[in-house]
Amino acid sequence: MKRIVTIALLALAVCACSRKPSEMSGNPLFEGWYADPEGIVFGNECWIYPTWSQPYDEQLFMDAFSSKDLVHWTKHEKVISKENISWLRRALWAPSVIERNGTYYLYFGANDMHEKGEGGIGVATADNPAGPFRDALGHPLIDEVINGAQPIDQFVFQDDDGAYYMYYGGWRHCNMVRLGDDLMSIVPFEDGEVYKEITPKGYVEGPFMLKRGGTYYFMWSEGGWTGPDYHVAYAMSDNPFGPFERIGTILESDPEVATGAGHHSVIKGRGKDEYYIIYHRHPLGATDGNDRVTCIERLYFDEDGKILPVKITFEGVPATRL
């Protein structure tokens, strides 16, 4: 009997040792200074397109990263660069990427435009998510300040009816436009308006739209991107045009983890209510505003559909199939 018990205990020990703890992504997700991460799922892979966080004059290309489990990431260098954008001079920022019928569209901000003719929001295309993306127009899609919104930080959102909208804007103003069927032009809304200002209270930059069920969650960044007070707030609406009344902050600094958590995107996993928030932050002790890294956390909702505040971590999220 004693021998049987011993064998059983040994079997349990072997079984316990063979159970590996879930791999975690860790934060940051990958090495290097990267900010403004756009996360999107293509097939069974998550792709992240960030800004290369360096001085403006050095920001002449973008890298991308892909993963099938949110833990192991492959770097794709220079998916877009100055060689394929004739009017790019500096400050290649905040990509937004979509796919339709096998073509990938990458929308970008360039040149930190302050006056008409200096730059603005452009669009590039490729037949592969790793690029190379090439400028599709030869000039900006939006090249002027309208309703006070600097043409940067664009996010393209497809609604359930097939319509594509672009939300964009810096300098504390946010506009919304409708894209044409070619996804490279702007067409008027049904009321004839072309640029709708939808700026919510507190808005600074970095708009993002998520539709969950029948609810539209409009999110944005507040504060200064170089400092510790950068954070993300949100609003809810029953339509993509708003109005968007600020509800509260969902992502912010933690003095024990990192500062300046903001400029995010959201992806959906396989589960019914499985969402992840991808964002940048400053490591503790960082002294340069460009010292920003890309991180990920789970995003949860309460029973009323409101977004619960996100706890930023060093651990990140467990490995998961997409």
Task: List each language-model region with its residue ranges.
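Enrichment for repetitive, rod-forming helical segments
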Residues: 9-10, 288
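Hydrophobic h-region of N-terminal signal peptides that target proteins for export
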Residues: 10-17
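Carbohydrate-active catalytic/glycan-binding domains of CAZyme proteins
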Residues: 17-322
